[in-house]
C-alpha cells in the first residue's frame, strides 16, 4: 500500500507521511520568530523578495486576528491564509456571542483543532503551515504559542518556525532572559532572526504588540536596531578570534 499517498492511514512504523510532508513544507518556508517580554510580544519574519512593481504589503507573513492577537506563519502562504481566515472568523463569532474578546489560549486550541482535523479527513490534505500566535489576555499578561501541521500546540517564551529554525532556537535557548523590555525583545528577536537570514533590515519585517496597541516597526527604526545587532555580532566574532589565537 502507498502510505505516502493515504492521508488517514498510518504506515507500519507509525508514520503519517502526509503530515510529515506538511512539516517539510514548513521547514522550507521563510523563517519567523516570536519573543515574549515583560509587557510586549515581538514578531519578526524573514521578508519574501518581491518583484519591482509588486506591492510588498500584500506579501506580509504577520496577520492580525483580533485587536489583541496576532499571528506569524511559515510554510505555504495559501494554506496560511486559510488558517488565518478560520481564526479571524472564530474571533468575530466569539465577540458576537459573548460581547468580549477571545482568550489567546482558547483561540490557539481552535487553530490547532482546525489543523488537526485536516490530518484525518479524506478528500483533503494537512495544512503545510506552522504558526506563532501571540496576544494579551484580560489580565494583561502576554502569551506566546506555536501550532504545527499535526495539530499540536504549545506555549513558548520565544519560538521559531521555518527554515533554519533549529539554529535560531539554539541561539534563543542560550540567550533568552525573562522579563525583557520592549527594546531588549526587539534586539533579541532581530539577533535571533539574523542567525537564519541574510544580514540587512531590508530582509526583515517586525511587529511590536503591546497591550492595547500594535505597530509595524518603521524602516528607519528597524535599520537602527539591525546596525546595533550587526556591530555586536562583529565584536563577538573578534573576541572569539582573539581567544582562539591566545589558545
Curated annotation (Swiss-Prot):
Highest classification ranks of the organism: Eukaryota, Discoba, Euglenozoa, Kinetoplastea, Metakinetoplastina
PANTHER family attached to this UniProt entry: PROTEASOME SUBUNIT ALPHA/BETA
Subunit annotation: The 26S proteasome consists of a 20S proteasome core and two 19S regulatory subunits. The 20S proteasome core is composed of 28 subunits that are arranged in four stacked rings, resulting in a barrel-shaped structure. The two end rings are each formed by seven alpha subunits, and the two central rings are each formed by seven beta subunits. The catalytic chamber with the active sites is on the inside of the barrel.
Organism of derivation: Trypanosoma brucei brucei
Location relative to the cell: Cytoplasm; Nucleus
A single GO BP: ubiquitin-dependent protein catabolic process
Membrane-spanning residues: none
CDD domains tied to this protein: proteasome_alpha_type_7
Function as written in the Swiss-Prot or TrEMBL entry: The proteasome is a multicatalytic proteinase complex which is characterized by its ability to cleave peptides with Arg, Phe, Tyr, Leu, and Glu adjacent to the leaving group at neutral or slightly basic pH. The proteasome has an ATP-dependent proteolytic activity.
Protein name: Proteasome subunit alpha type-7
GO cellular component: cytoplasm; cytosol; nucleolus; nucleoplasm; nucleus; proteasome core complex; proteasome core complex, alpha-subunit complex
Record keywords: Cytoplasm, Nucleus, Proteasome
Family: Belongs to the peptidase T1A family.
SMART domains, sorted: Proteasome_A_N
Gene (UniProt): PSA4
Coiled-coil intervals: none
Amino acid at each position: 500500500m502507498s502510505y505516502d499517498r493515504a492521508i488517514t492511514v498510518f504506515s507500519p512504523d507509525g508514520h503519517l507521511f502526509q503530515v510529515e510532508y506538511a512539516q517539510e513544507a514548513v521547514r522550507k518556508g521563510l523563517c519567523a520568530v516570536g519573543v515574549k517580554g515583560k509587557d510586549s510580544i515581538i514578531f519578526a519574519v524573514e521578508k519574501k523578495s518581491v518583484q519591482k512593481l509588486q506591492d510588498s504589503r500584500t506579501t506580509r507573513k504577520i496577520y492580525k486576528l483580533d485587536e489583541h492577537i496576532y499571528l506569524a506563519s511559515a510554510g505555504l502562504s495559501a494554506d496560511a491564509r486559510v488558517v488565518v481566515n478560520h481564526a479571524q472568523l472564530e474571533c468575530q463569532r466569539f465577540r458576537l456571542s459573548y460581547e468580549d474578546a477571545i482568550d489567546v489560549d482558547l483561540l490557539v486550541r481552535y487553530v490547532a483543532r482546525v489543523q488537526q482535523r485536516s490530518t484525518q479527513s479524506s478528500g483533503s490534505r494537512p495544512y503545510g503551515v506552522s504558526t506563532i500566535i501571540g496576544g494579551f489576555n484580560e489580565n494583561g499578561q502576554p502569551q506566546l504559542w506555536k501550532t504545527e501541521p499535526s495539530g499540536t500546540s504549545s506555549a513558548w517564551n520565544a519560538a521559531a518556525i521555518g527554515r533554519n529554525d533549529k539554529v535560531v532556537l539554539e541561539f534563543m535557548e542560550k540567550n533568552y532572559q525573562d522579563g525583557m523590555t520592549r527594546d531588549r525583545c526587539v534586539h533579541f528577536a532581530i539577533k535571533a532572526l539574523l542567525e537564519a537570514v541574510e544580514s540587512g533590515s531590508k530582509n526583515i519585517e517586525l511587529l511590536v504588540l503591546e497591550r492595547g496597541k500594535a505597530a509595524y516597526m518603521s524602516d528607519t527604526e528597524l535599520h537602527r536596531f539591525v546596525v546595533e545587532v550587526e556591530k555586536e555580532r562583529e565584536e563577538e566574532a573578534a573576541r572569539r578570534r582573539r581567544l582562539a589565537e591566545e589558545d
